[in-house]
């Protein structure tokens, strides 16, 4: 019913429109006849028009704006708002579209904006934690249990009996006499009943002149609270002083540098330690005078020290061992070392499937002031590793059977960023002086010897020396003792940097040892055992129980453990964790990350273009505008392009009336301010200004 009432009204409007249309058409025709250029709203220059801007010279025309039908190769958004709206409408990131779809509800927009930003922050906080964990380079320890035939390790056994070489036997006897005199003067100890005290003192005056650095008695400084003036008292042992039995006295010997400008006392609170160290210091000097520190040993055969040797129930031979001499531990024998052509293999565990030795522990040519223990010293190590008897060995007790069971363990560590280890020592700044592979102990001892040669001018006899370097002897290097003890103190404090330079190897094989002891031989069996050993080795055992010791070394089991390190967080796991966090917080994929990168790139480009436009507008020369105005003023109106005024210009129908001010001619087109913005003018604003056309025609 409402439709019927509205239909006539619509027809009436159409009729009125029809009746008015001729009139409007007529007015339009009259307007065209009076004005050669119809009025158009001024929106800036049209497409293709040249713009005049301030500058140093004429500027090329602006590129023509693309129409709806054509598209440029590279396009950027005109504003941040347009870029943001395009991103939110087209991205695959969840929640971004909620920032623009609810723009008419500011509360929802604010809620989603805060939620989106919080989610974004939480995700990147998790990213930071993941990267922090990855850059800490954590490792995982993998433990594997393997079972196979095992290579038997090298075993080194020493006699604990420093040998008296024939070449230096007289000097050692002289040192013994000086030491006896020192013990008598300090402790009234009379070791030779055939000598009287007076004769002993007279001989000591002659003997002490042959050896420098005599032992002295030193008074310790008083406590600081006693109020007494501290003084470093010292007296020679040649003085008739009471026996050293007071706690405020120490025993030591003086060491000085080359020009005697600096001296110190190497002191000990125990007289036993002081005498042993003093004797050891002189023994090293005497031993360094040998032309060869490893001469042919006077123990003619292996049987003089080792009565029996069996491995896997088979007897040993000379091809299974090598020998060397240690300054403190005497003659040493290494079984199954790298020089052995056929390394021993263990295919069964147990005491009967290992190495069994019966050792002689008598000390017929013993140096009592140098070694105070009896028995033997043993060490288990790898085939290509030197035997550091001071660091890893232990003593065997005479009259006891020592059974040592072994378990092999291998450790493979990661180097580089994951750990401070070296593969073969080639990247360690210390030269290896040992004819063996790199180990941390080899590096540390080589480092000390290197510093000893550099600072003291000679080599320490306990470590290998390079070619062309002599061992230290105070007859040639009078101050080497001063230098050595100073260097030893710096070495203990790691002032030399040896412990920091020498890194552990990445691959290490260790042998875990556990020892068991039992009395051997028993009371019932000792008679026939000692008799058989004497007949077999053509040697009479004087002190039966204290003259022999037995050693058994075997694998407890053939299962060995391998501890290997692996990266806990790899690049693959890092990317997986990052993707999991991205999917958790935004439910997106890798392409969404590319969209984010594209957004950041567009933001940077828009910012750069805006800064460049502002820079040009601020620092462009203002003199160009006046010159441009004069150039346009001198240009005839007929020379304007047709697109600037599309209708042909003609003189006005009548001159202006008298008394009226004639219109001024337009000397320059108006500045195109609309072109300074980031957005292009609309398409319908390309029509020229009618008034401008008319004035230009004048």
Curated annotation (Swiss-Prot):
GO terms for cellular component: acrosomal vesicle; apical plasma membrane; ciliary membrane; cortical actin cytoskeleton; cytoplasm; cytosol; external side of plasma membrane; extracellular exosome. The record marks 205-206, 231-232 as: Cleavage by Furin. It catalyses: Na(+)(in) = Na(+)(out). InterPro entries: ENaC, ENaC_chordates, ENaC_CS. Disulfide bonds join 158-332, 256-263, 309-316, 421-506, 443-483, 443-502, 447-498, 456-483, 456-506, 458-472. Originally identified and characterized by its inhibition by the diuretic drug amiloride. Keywords: Cell membrane, Cell projection, Cilium, Cytoplasm, Cytoplasmic vesicle, Disulfide bond, Flagellum, Glycoprotein, Ion channel, Ion transport, Membrane, Sodium, Sodium channel, Sodium transport, Transmembrane, Transmembrane helix, Transport, Ubl conjugation. Residues 1-110, 611-698 are cytoplasmic. Its main location: membrane. It is a multi-pass membrane protein. Residues 229-243 have a biased composition (Polar residues). It is found in: Apical cell membrane; Cell projection, Cilium; Cytoplasmic granule; Cytoplasm. Residues 200-270 are annotated as: Gating release of inhibition by proteolysis (GRIP). The chain crosses the membrane at residues 111-131, 590-610. Detected in kidney, lung and testis (at protein level). In the testis, detected within the seminiferous tubules but not in the interstitial cells (at protein level). Heterotrimer; containing an alpha/SCNN1A, a beta/SCNN1B and a gamma/SCNN1G subunit. Interacts with WWP1 (via WW domains). Interacts with WWP2 (via WW domains); inhibits the channel. Interacts with BPIFA1; the interaction is indirect via SCNN1B and inhibits the proteolytic processing of SCNN1A and SCNN1G and the activation of ENaC. Interacts with the full-length immature form of PCSK9 (pro-PCSK9). Belongs to the amiloride-sensitive sodium channel (TC 1.A.6) family. SCNN1A subfamily. This is one of the three pore-forming subunits of the heterotrimeric epithelial sodium channel (ENaC), a critical regulator of sodium balance and fluid homeostasis. ENaC operates in epithelial tissues, where it mediates the electrodiffusion of sodium ions from extracellular fluid through the apical membrane of cells, with water following osmotically. It plays a key role in maintaining sodium homeostasis through electrogenic sodium reabsorption in the kidneys. Additionally, ENaC is essential for airway surface liquid homeostasis, which is crucial for proper mucus clearance. NCBIfam families: ENaC (TIGR00859). This is Epithelial sodium channel subunit alpha. It comes from Rattus norvegicus. The gene is Scnn1a.
């Amino acid at each position: 019913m409402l439709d019927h009432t509205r239909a006539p009204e619509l027809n009436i409007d159409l009729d009125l429109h029809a009746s008015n249309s001729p009139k409007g058409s007529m007015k339009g025709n009259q307007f065209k006849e009076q004005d050669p250029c119809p009025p158009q709203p001024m929106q800036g220059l049209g497409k293709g028009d040249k713009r005049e801007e301030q500058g140093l010279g004429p500027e090329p025309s602006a590129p023509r704006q693309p129409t709806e039908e054509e598209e440029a190769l590279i396009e950027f958004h005109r504003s941040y708002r347009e870029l943001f709206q395009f991103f939110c409408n087209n991205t695959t990131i969840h929640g971004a579209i909620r920032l623009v779809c609810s723009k008419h509800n500011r509360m929802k927009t604010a809620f989603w904006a805060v939620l989106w930003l919080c989610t974004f922050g939480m995700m990147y906080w998790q990213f930071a934690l993941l990267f922090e964990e990855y850059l800490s380079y954590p490792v995982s320890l993998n433990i594997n249990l393997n079972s196979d035939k095992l290579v038997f390790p090298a075993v080194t056994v020493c006699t604990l009996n420093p040998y008296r070489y024939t070449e230096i036997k007289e000097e050692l006897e002289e040192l013994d006499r000086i030491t006896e005199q020192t013990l008598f003067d300090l402790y009234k100890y009379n070791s030779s009943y055939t000598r009287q005290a007076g004769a002993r003192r007279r001989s000591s005056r002659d003997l002490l002149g042959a050896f420098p650095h005599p032992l002295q008695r030193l008074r310790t400084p008083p406590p600081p609270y006693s109020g007494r003036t501290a003084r470093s008292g010292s007296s020679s042992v040649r003085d008739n002083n009471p026996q050293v039995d007071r706690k405020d006295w120490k025993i030591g010997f003086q060491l000085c540098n080359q020009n005697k400008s600096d001296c110190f006392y190497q002191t000990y609170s125990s007289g036993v330690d002081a005498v042993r160290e003093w004797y050891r210091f002189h023994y090293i000097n005497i031993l360094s005078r040998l032309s060869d520190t490893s001469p042919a040993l006077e123990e003619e055969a292996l049987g003089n020290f080792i009565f029996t040797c069996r491995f896997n129930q088979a007897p040993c031979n000379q091809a299974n061992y090598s020998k060397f001499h240690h300054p403190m531990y005497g003659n040493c024998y290494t079984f199954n070392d790298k020089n052995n052509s056929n390394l021993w293999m263990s295919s069964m565990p147990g005491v009967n499937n290992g190495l069994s030795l019966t050792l002689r522990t008598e000390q017929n040519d013993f140096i009592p002031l140098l070694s105070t223990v009896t028995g033997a010293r043993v060490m288990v190590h790898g085939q290509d590793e030197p035997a550091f008897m001071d660091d890893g060995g232990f003593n065997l007790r005479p009259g006891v059977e020592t059974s040592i069971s072994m378990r092999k363990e291998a450790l493979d560590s990661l180097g580089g960023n994951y750990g401070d280890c070296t593969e073969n020592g080639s990247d360690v700044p210390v030269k290896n002086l040992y004819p063996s592979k790199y180990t941390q102990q080899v590096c540390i001892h080589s480092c000390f010897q290197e510093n000893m040669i550099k600072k003291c001018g000679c080599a320490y006899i306990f470590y290998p020396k390079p070619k062309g370097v002599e061992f230290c002897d105070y007859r040639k290097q009078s101050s080497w003792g001063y230098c050595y003890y100073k260097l030893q103190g710096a070495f203990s404090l790691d002032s030399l940097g040896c412990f920091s330079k020498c890194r552990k190897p990445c691959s290490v094989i260790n042998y875990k040892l556990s020892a068991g002891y039992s009395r051997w031989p028993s009371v019932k069996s000792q008679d026939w055992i000692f008799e058989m050993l004497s007949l077999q080795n053509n040697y009479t055992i004087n002190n039966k129980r204290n003259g022999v010791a037995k050693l058994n070394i075997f694998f407890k089991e053939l299962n060995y453990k391998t501890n290997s390190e692996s990266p806990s967080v790899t690049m693959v796991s890092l990317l997986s964790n990052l993707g999991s966090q991205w999917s958790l917080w935004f439910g997106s994929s890798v392409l969404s990350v590319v969209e984010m990168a594209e957004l950041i790139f567009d933001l940077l480009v828009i910012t750069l273009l805006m800064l460049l436009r502002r820079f040009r507008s601020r620092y462009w020369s203002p003199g160009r505008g006046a010159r441009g105005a004069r150039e346009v003023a001198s240009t005839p109106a007929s020379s304007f392009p047709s697109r600037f005024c599309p209708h042909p210009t003609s003189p006005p129908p009548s001159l202006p009336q008298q008394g009226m001010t004639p219109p001024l001619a337009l000397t320059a087109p108006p500045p195109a301010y609309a072109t300074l913005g980031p957005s292009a003018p609309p398409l319908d604003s390309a029509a020229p200004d009618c008034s401008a056309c008319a004035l230009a025609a004048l």
